[in-house]
A protein has these predicted regions:
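Short beta-edge/loop segments at beta->alpha junctions of small alpha/beta modules
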Residues: 2, 15-91
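Short, leucine-enriched amphipathic alpha-helices that occur as contiguous helical runs
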Residues: 4-13, 178
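Short, charged/polar micro-motifs that form catalytic or ligand-binding hotspots
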Residues: 17, 36, 117, 167, ...
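Short, well-structured alpha-helical interface segments that form or flank functional binding sites
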Residues: 22, 42-45, 122, 126, ...
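Hydrophobic alpha-helical interaction segments
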Residues: 139-243
Length: 243
């Protein structure tokens, strides 16, 4: 099926050009205006071939991207702490990350970086005691008023929070950047680690420079009840042209 000399493949490439991310439904609507008989199967098959050729990349359920490099967090900043917790509590379900892992995306580099540990609420005190005994500056699930008054940011600062169960366990390891960005938004509200504009700039810098799983991020944001602000920033990316 063609439009003039252009194939469906050509039109998808043209549609994707200049976009960091796009939705399947958005693409289909654009093409259906010119090809009333275009089926979802034909469109999906063409997208599959473009992905296989490396021109377009998967960005989660119903989302695509023109960014080849997938977002990954450097594990080094939390490796020592992670190993300490694993040695002491080998059967504990937990995860951790640090703002240091996002250092390449800050517009203004913070004076101190903060690490976060998430685990079962009944286990947090034991983890806090362990980290405190190893010279970490720890805070156990501080609420907004407490956090803004009493948290002292310095080297090896760790905030411990209850682990939010998200979908299946097997989906967790691959979603660390997406989760960290959503969790950081919540921390801007609770701890005032950075203001809204700095957060927005960091978010934009990250998702323009490497590819995220947009669908997974939106699912997690919905689970954490912050889907609107996260979606708004993603839509801002969609409204700007990629180089």
């Amino acid at each position: 099926m063609t439009s003039g000399k252009k194939t469906i493949k050509d039109e998808i490439i043209e549609f994707a050009k200049g976009r960091y991310y796009f939705r399947f439904d958005e693409l289909r609507q654009s093409l259906v205006n010119q090809h009333s008989g275009l089926s979802n199967d034909t469109l999906k098959k063409t997208l599959y071939l473009l992905k296989k050729a490396g021109g377009i990349f998967d960005a989660g359920r119903g989302w695509y991207s023109t960014i080849a490099q997938e977002c990954r967090l450097d594990k080094a900043p939390v490796q020592e702490m992670e190993q300490l917790i694993k040695r002491s509590f080998p059967f504990l379900d937990f995860r951790c990350w640090s703002t240091l892992q996002l250092r390449d995306y800050f517009h203004h580099m913070p004076n101190w970086f903060v690490s976060f540990v998430y685990s079962d609420i009944d286990s947090l005190q034991a983890v806090k005691d362990l980290l405190t005994d190893h010279n970490y500056n720890t805070y156990l699930n501080p609420l907004k008023q407490e956090a803004r008054k009493f948290i002292e940011l310095r080297e090896k600062t760790v905030i411990l929070r209850p682990l939010v169960v998200y979908r299946s366990a097997r989906s967790m390891p691959a979603l660390e950047p997406e989760k960290a960005i959503v969790d950081l938004y919540l921390e801007t509200e609770l701890t005032n680690l950075l203001d809204r504009e700095e957060y927005r700039r960091l978010f934009l810098a990250l998702i323009r420079s490497c590819r995220i799983n947009v669908a997974a991020m939106l699912d997690y944001a919905r689970n954490r009840k912050v889907s609107d602000p996260i979606r708004n920033i993603i839509e801002e990316v969609n409204s700007t042209k990629a180089p």
